[in-house]
């Protein structure tokens, strides 16, 4: 192929007779043989040789610039696609690495949680065994109580290196650790102190040489052959010695050389047998502890369990286990003897005690409980707990303010102990549980375990829960002033300012549109009042209910069936009668099922006792001359139904004898009984089982009074606004309060602490919650608000 130079048409590579494609896309003919430039015009065409017609139908040829341009374009596209591919590949690799790491993290988390669960189960079994022994004096048969085993440790045991290499590596590591400890100033004298603690724990005197203990006594200590007399002596040891034992157990991992030195007198066969037993029981958990940092970290979190467990006496705890603490160090491959400098050791001991005193408060959470346990074990017997009434806690006065404490001591009241005794709510067994300081472990359970009856109240655990809104009752047109539950059925009655009462069956629900709660439609509406309904009471059998209104009447109703048809015809027999005697609004009602009597208090200043079944239902009238003011609330005394308590707008509350109509005790919060408080009382309730009265005040306070002396035993600011309503659960464990700050608060009557706060209603005209109630037999609570809603919580 010849290379020809072209003129205006450019260069071309082609057979001379064929046309060629220039860079610009124009066809050009090759120049003549004489090298004259071909202009691509007609003269050049004439000299081209063959005619042009058949030449145009042949395939077009490419020029070098066009080919280079195409190659460069394709190469750029290929490089771009390759770059995109590499980016996608890197992203996918990063995604794969992230998912692998996430999977590995989840597996590690799962293993750690499984390990913790096993350790918690093991610790709980130990605590139950100790509790059973402390309560009944006998060992609890739980089978072979073994430390939990983990898969990683089993594989490590299976792949154990030869003993000689392991011993050599262990020696080198120990020497390196000694060098590091010397560099940071942690000398052998500290180890000497640790050695001395081991000797004191074994009962050896300081003057005895190392290894001089008799083999028989040592074997008895190590293998658990301890007599009951020795156990009793250990329980009566001074608390200081036991606390030293706790300090040792907190900080020291036992010295392997000292342990091996002390068991030299044990026969070889028994030693091997004991080591074999250790391996079976623990599966290398203690021996390979340093090889598995996760296991070591998990075990460190349970140091407080070891401390509490060894509180009964270090010797007893050492001798009664499976030999874990001793056998762990028996596996050490070497043994050394440390010389103890008694003078230096005693100085370091004193210095250590001083340091521990400074750290003791923040070091151990359960330290106080352990000290209380030691003190209680030193006494001849546990504090006596009276069987019907609460006992006084030794630490109750220290938990109160000086002012309130002085009042409590004057009145000798039935206090709510918040300390060691805790016998207001709990029985003697719960006192023992709190003394042991189990903390959260006391609530843990292990499946397939023996069920020990601790004589706890039946409904105590049922109430230890979080209440959540479940039902919303929306059919009233004005504020809901009062509500009450049926004694047995899941049925609620509400009284409203819209002049009506409504009956609700909580089992007939309608799903709400935009809420997790359920709407309930009323199944019956009571209509007889000609004004707002202010108060409500239901009989103990649930067959009648009573309502008091601003029209000064008390309406007596027969309760319809919970399964009544809401669209049934009107039944006139539902309204059983009307009790007329008051001349102003009836603000409070209370019913007693013992004598089927009804109490009412009115704005006319009187409190009236009714027996609705009689022809003249009004039995007696109290405070007829308004000598104490205007009554605001009334209730029967729970532990003495022959008495009732009434609160007044003057800030005082009076206990009346229903038989004699005489006032017995005035409950006043003032130090000087001649002065009366101006704090308006909105609600008064009586504790169901104790001689205690609780009042809710306009000044945001809730106050507790002793019914026998009339003295206030506790006072607390309970809400951010006026406290309007109170309710005590049927077991007397919890108190519920409602306020105009839109919140419901649940209080533990033992500790006077708020267990839960619920924001339930909205404000309307600066008022929010009017009433709260517990269901007598089911897990329901309810609240009534000024926003025309009633809410039920489960």
Curated annotation (Swiss-Prot):
Keywords: Acetylation, Calmodulin-binding, Coiled coil, Cytoplasm, Membrane, Phosphoprotein, Repeat, WD repeat. One of its GO terms (biological process) is negative regulation of intracellular estrogen receptor signaling pathway. InterPro entries: G-protein_beta_WD-40_rep, Striatin_N, WD40/YVTN_repeat-like_dom_sf, WD40_repeat_CS, WD40_repeat_dom_sf, WD40_rpt, WD_repeat_striatin. Residues 76-135 form a coiled coil. One of its GO terms (molecular function) is protein-containing complex binding. WD repeats lie at residues 475-514, 528-567, 581-620, 676-715, 718-757, 764-794. The modification Phosphoserine is found at residues 200, 212, 227, 255, 332. Calmodulin-binding scaffolding protein which is the center of the striatin-interacting phosphatase and kinase (STRIPAK) complexes. STRIPAK complexes have critical roles in protein (de)phosphorylation and are regulators of multiple signaling pathways including Hippo, MAPK, nuclear receptor and cytoskeleton remodeling. Different types of STRIPAK complexes are involved in a variety of biological processes such as cell growth, differentiation, apoptosis, metabolism and immune regulation. This is Striatin-3. The lineage of its organism: Eukaryota, Metazoa, Chordata, Craniata, Vertebrata. The gene is Strn3.
């Amino acid at each position: 192929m010849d290379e020809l130079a072209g003129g205006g048409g450019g260069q071309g590579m082609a057979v001379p007779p064929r046309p060629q494609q220039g860079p610009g896309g124009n066809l050009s003919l090759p120049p003549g043989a004489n090298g004259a430039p071909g202009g691509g015009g007609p003269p050049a065409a004439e000299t081209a040789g063959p005619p042009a017609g058949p030449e145009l139908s042949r395939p077009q040829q490419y020029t070098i610039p066009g080919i280079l341009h195409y190659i460069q374009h394709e190469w750029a596209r290929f490089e771009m696609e390759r770059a995109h591919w590499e980016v996608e590949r890197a992203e996918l690799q990063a995604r794969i690495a992230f998912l692998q790491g996430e999977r590995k993290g989840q597996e590690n988390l799962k293993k750690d949680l499984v390990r913790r669960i096993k350790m918690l189960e093991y610790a709980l079994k130990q605590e139950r065994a100790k509790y059973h022994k402390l309560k009944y004096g006998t060992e609890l048969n739980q089978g072979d109580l073994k430390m939990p085993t983990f898969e990683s440790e089993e594989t490590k045991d299976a792949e154990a290196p030869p003993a000689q290499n392991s011993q050599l590596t262990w020696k080198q590591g120990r020497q390196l650790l000694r060098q590091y400890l010397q560099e940071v100033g942690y000398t052998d004298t500290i180890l000497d102190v640790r050695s001395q603690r081991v000797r004191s724990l074994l009962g050896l005197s300081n003057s005895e040489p190392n290894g001089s203990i008799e083999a028989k006594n040592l074997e008895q200590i190590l293998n658990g052959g301890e007599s009951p007399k020795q156990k009793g002596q250990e329980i009566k040891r001074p608390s200081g010695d036991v606390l030293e034992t706790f300090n040792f157990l907190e900080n020291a991992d036992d010295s392997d050389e000292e342990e091996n030195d002390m068991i030299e007198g044990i026969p070889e066969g028994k030693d091997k047998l004991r080591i074999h037993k250790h391996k079976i029981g623990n599966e290398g958990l203690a021996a390979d502890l340093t090889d598995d940092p996760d296991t070591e970290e998990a075990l460190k979190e349970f140091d407080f369990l070891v401390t509490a467990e060894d509180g009964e006496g270090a010797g007893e705890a050492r001798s009664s286990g499976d030999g874990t603490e001793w056998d762990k160090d028996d596996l050490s491959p070497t043994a050394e003897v440390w010389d103890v400098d008694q003078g230096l050791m005693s100085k370091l001991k004193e210095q250590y005690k001083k340091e521990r005193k400074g750290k003791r408060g923040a070091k151990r959470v359960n330290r106080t409980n352990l000290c209380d346990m030691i003190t209680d074990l030193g006494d001849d017997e546990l504090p006596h707990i009276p069987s019907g009434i609460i006992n006084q806690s030794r630490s109750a006065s220290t938990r109160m303010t000086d002012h309130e404490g002085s009042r409590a001591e004057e009145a000798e009241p039935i206090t709510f102990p918040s300390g060691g005794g805790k016998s207001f709510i709990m029985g003697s067994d719960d006192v023992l549980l709190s003394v042991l300081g189990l903390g959260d472990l006391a609530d843990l359970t292990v499946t397939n375990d023996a069920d020990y009856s601790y004589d706890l109240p039946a409904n105590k655990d049922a109430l230890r829960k979080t209440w959540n809104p479940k039902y919303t009752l929306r059919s009233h047109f004005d504020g809901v002033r009062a509500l009450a539950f049926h004694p047995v059925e899941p049925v609620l009655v509400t009284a409203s300012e819209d002049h009506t009462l409504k009956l609700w069956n909580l089992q007939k629900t309608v799903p709400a549109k935009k809420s997790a709660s359920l709407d309930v439609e009323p199944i019956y509406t009571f209509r007889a009042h000609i004004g707002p309904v202010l108060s409500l009471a239901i009989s103990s059998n649930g067959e009648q209910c009573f309502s008091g209104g601003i029209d000064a009447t008390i309406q007596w109703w027969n309760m319809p069936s919970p399964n009544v048809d809401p669209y049934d015809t009107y039944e006139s027999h539902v309204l059983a009668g009307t009790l007329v005697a008051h001349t102003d609004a009836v603000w409070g009602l209370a019913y007693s099922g013992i004598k089927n009597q009804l109490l009412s208090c009115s704005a006319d200043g009187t409190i009236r006792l009714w027996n609705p079944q009689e022809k003249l239902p009004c039995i007696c009238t109290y405070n007829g001359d308004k000598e104490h003011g205007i009554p605001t609330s009334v209730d029967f005394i729970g532990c003495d139904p022959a008495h009732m308590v009434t609160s007044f707008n003057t800030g005082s509350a009076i206990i009346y004898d229903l038989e004699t109509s005489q006032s017995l005790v005035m409950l006043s919060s003032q130090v000087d009984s001649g002065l009366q408080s101006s704090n308006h009382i909105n609600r008064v309730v009586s504790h169901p089982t104790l001689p205690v009265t609780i009042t809710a005040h306009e000044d945001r306070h809730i106050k507790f009074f002793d019914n026998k002396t009339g003295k206030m035993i506790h006072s607390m600011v309970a809400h951010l606004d006026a406290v309007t309503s109170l309710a005590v659960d049927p077991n007397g464990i919890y108190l519920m309060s409602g306020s105009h700050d839109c919140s419901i608060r649940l209080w533990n009557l033992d500790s006077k602490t708020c267990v839960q706060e619920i924001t339930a209603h909205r404000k309307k005209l600066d008022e929010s919650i009017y009433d709260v109630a517990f269901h007598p037999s089911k897990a329901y609570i309810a609240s009534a608000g000024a926003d025309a809603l009633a809410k039920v919580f489960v």
